[in-house]
From Swiss-Prot:
The lineage of its organism: Eukaryota, Viridiplantae, Streptophyta, Embryophyta, Tracheophyta. GO terms for molecular function: dioxygenase activity; gibberellin 20-oxidase activity; metal ion binding. The active site is at residue 315. Gene3D superfamilies: B-lactam Antibiotic, Isopenicillin N Synthase, Chain. This is Gibberellin 20 oxidase 2. Keywords: Iron, Metal-binding, Oxidoreductase. Fe cation binds at residues 249, 251, 305. Contributes to the promotion of internode elongation in response to submergence via ethylene and gibberellin signalings.
Length: 389
């Protein structure tokens, strides 16, 4: 992979929650997005420019549904077939779906239903879990700290997960933030995150096979990982053609596991066209993030994707983002590292970069590489400034 040289990113600080930086129009902080669905028109901060707003979608994305049960069964032919499906999809656009994943269907339904129950609460109750800008956990309406001048038509609830703690961190978060009445909901999401973590490690084994790298490298790399769980709610929209549920972006994380309900909305940019991804009953969508793109030495792609909304039906999805431990050094396995296309970095480095210089495009890793190791002239100028200060 030959790295391109993007325009250097401009410094960006996340604006305060429920604000609209640069638009001159305050976001409707007193209302949740779901409270706006009965309005005849969407508020101006939610309108996306014509170049970004929803054009007519192309044909559905040709995405394999991979049977990951073959990893448990030891079916050699099935393993070869699954590895080939994953390799072809990840080298092209980074998306595939998995079936026979072992996640309990009743648990998945309970997790989706829990999202519905939370987002239907009065705004005052939801705001008890209000997310503080710069942190992972909490509730946002329109996710305004990320897409400030073009608000997405959605609400989210996010929380961190790791299985190294003595106490169940997700269950404790719900009880401590929302109160003891939410303890049952917290237990559902604690169990769901535990199953997502196990599924993510299974997928890492499949990625190892598909890349032909050292067995156990990726599974061990993420064994003590941290993760982010996000519940997404997209209310019906009076003008769906003028806004987006989630703007075009690449995930900076390693891997995303997405559970959709039966309402479509996910789209992936392939060959300049937005291609929809229809929900497959019982399957989950997997996509490669920027961190795994670096771990594969650029062989597997982290691609732009987005979510569209509709006028009639609400949509729910659950996204589990697998992240390395903050101090883990991200580098490809030795068999895939010659030549190494990206410098070594830690997840903390990448998070710091995305928070300061957010770029919703496919060149994030190239821009990040320049940020880590600027050209010699820039480095010399920086050194002079630091010496004079």
């Amino acid at each position: 992979m030959v790295a391109e040289h993007p325009t250097p990113p401009q410094p960006h600080q996340p604006p305060p929650m429920d604000s609209t930086a640069g638009s001159g129009i305050a976001a409707p902080a007193a209302a949740a997005v779901c409270d706006l669905r009965m309005e005849p028109k969407i508020p101006e901060p939610f309108v996306w420019p014509n170049g970004d707003a929803r054009p007519a979608s192309a044909a559905e994305l040709d995405m394999p549904v991979v049977d990951v049960g073959v990893l448990r069964d030891g079916d050699a032919e099935g393993l070869r077939r699954a590895a080939a499906q994953v390799a072809a999809a990840c080298a092209t656009h980074g998306f595939f779906q998995v079936s026979e994943h072992g996640v309990d269907a009743a648990l998945a339904r309970a997790a989706l239903d829990g999202a519905s129950d939370f987002f239907r609460l009065p705004l005052a109750e939801k705001r008890r879990a209000r997310r503080v800008p710069g942190t992972v956990s909490g509730y946002t309406s329109a996710h305004a700290d990320r897409f400030a001048s073009k608000l997405p038509w959605k609400e989210t609830l996010s929380f961190g997960f790791h299985d190294r703690a003595a106490a169940p961190v997700v269950a404790d978060y719900f009880s401590s933030t929302l109160g003891p009445d939410f303890a049952p909901m917290g237990r559902v999401y604690q169990k769901y995150c535990e199953e997502m973590k196990e599924l993510s490690l299974t997928i890492m084994e499949l990625l190892e096979l598909s890349l032909g790298v050292e067995r156990g490298y990726y599974r061990e790399f993420f064994a003590d990982s941290s993760s982010i769980m996000r519940c997404n709610y997209y209310p019906p929209c009076p003008e769906p053609e003028r806004t987006l549920g989630t703007g075009p972006h690449c995930d900076p994380t390693a891997l995303t596991i997405l559970l959709q309900d039966d309402v479509g909305g996910l789209e992936v940019l392939v060959d300049g066209e937005w291609r929809p991804v229809s929900p497959v009953p019982g399957a989950m969508v997997i996509n490669i993030g920027d961190t795994f793109m670096a771990l594969s030495n650029g062989r597997y792609k982290s691609c732009l994707h987005r979510a569209v909304v509709n006028q009639r039906r609400e949509r729910r999805s659950l996204a589990f983002f697998l992240c390395p431990r903050e101090d883990r050094v991200v580098r490809p396995p030795p068999s895939a590292a010659t030549p190494q296309h990206y410098p070594d970095f830690t997840w903390a480095d990448l998070m710091r970069f995305t928070q300061r210089h957010y770029r919703a495009d496919t060149r994030t890793l190239d821009a990040f590489t320049r940020w880590l190791a600027p050209p010699a002239a820039d480095a010399a100028a920086t050194a002079q400034v630091e010496a004079a200060s």
